[in-house]
Amino acid sequence: MSGDTEEVTRLRKPRFSYEENQILIREVRAHYPMLYGAQSRRLSVAERRRVWEGIAAKINAITNWKRTAQEVQKRWNDFKRRTKEKLARVPHSTQSGTAEEAMTAEEETIFAILGPGVMPGSSHYGPVTHLGAMDFNPSGPGSSSPETSLSAPCAPIEAPLLLHPKESPSPTSQLHIVQLPHLTPSPDPSECPSPPPPGSGTPLLTPSGVAQHYDPTVAMLRAQQETAEAIRHLTYTLRQSMDRLTNVLAAILPLVPHQPPESPTPSGILGPVYYPTKTEPESEPCCPVTYEEENGEDGGEEEIQEVIAEPPRSPSPPPPNKRKRFGYLSQRKRRGRWKNL
């Protein structure tokens, strides 16, 4: 069983040595813009893999074990993870922590490469001078130029993270500079006023001057005055225009001849107009057929002469939904009642 354990142990590669870690940190710092910076978006995955392969080749040049690009990248990710975890546990100043929580030189270098964005709660601290950021960088002849160039843009935010408990003379001096204009008399107009310190706002403005420039009541009163003046001017213009129009009408009316109103003549009066209306024919009280009996001279033959009166006009058809009913005197359709006579 022990032989199997030794066999497994032999197959595992040794840990990264100090020299390998230094080469890894130095090469990642040199190629950081291409791997994680602004240029990484323009590079493809294959191009970034070739960068990691170049870093692995430089590490393999000093060791007998061959590191792959994936192993080198994993080692760098472990560095970042451990540095972030220690920053979360350690106080904002490395000098106030214990020996176990103090950051090593490698971790400080990695923190300088990554910037203050990896620090939890870094957005709660305000900007400070560049001197505190320079104190954080590890002193060394070989790490001056690249590290300074990378940490310089992030200097205003790095300082409060690590140098907060130390004495800070610069904010006190700024406070005195801010209070001096209030205590000293007004300067000579011929002299050029010194620019206010950064972050102090506008200390030269007195409270009365600020109230005079930003008082909403004064601005409202001015707006009301301007509106009243505009209304007064418009009223005067309208009155003047109405007076001129009245004078013009008074001058024109005498020149127009007077014409009496035309009265309508009797011949022009139209009589009432009657429109014909449709009426139904009156029903005849008697039967439309009359019979006359004449006695002839030929021996008493009776000749019946049928006289048919002119049939009246048929009335207008009733509405479709109304049933027509016949009365006692209303006309009915003959159904051949007198055909045999």
Curated annotation (Swiss-Prot):
Protein name as annotated: Myb-related transcription factor, partner of profilin
Q: Where is the Myb-like domain?
A: 8-80
Biological source species: Xenopus laevis (African clawed frog)
Q: Does the keyword Membrane apply?
A: no
- UniProt entry keywords in alphabetical sequence: DNA-binding, Nucleus, Repressor, Transcription, Transcription regulation
State the residue spans of region: Disordered.
84-103, 180-210, 309-341
| Superkingdom of origin organism | Eukaryota
- Which spans does this entry mark as compositional bias, Basic residues? 321-341
Recall the GO molecular function terms of this protein's record.
Answer: DNA-binding transcription factor activity, RNA polymerase II-specific; RNA polymerase II cis-regulatory region sequence-specific DNA binding
Task: Tell where it localizes.
Answer: Nucleus
Classification via PANTHER family: MYB-RELATED TRANSCRIPTION FACTOR, PARTNER OF PROFILIN
User: Where is it found, in Gene Ontology cellular component terms?
Assistant: nucleus
Offer one example of a GO biological process linked to this entry: regulation of transcription by RNA polymerase II
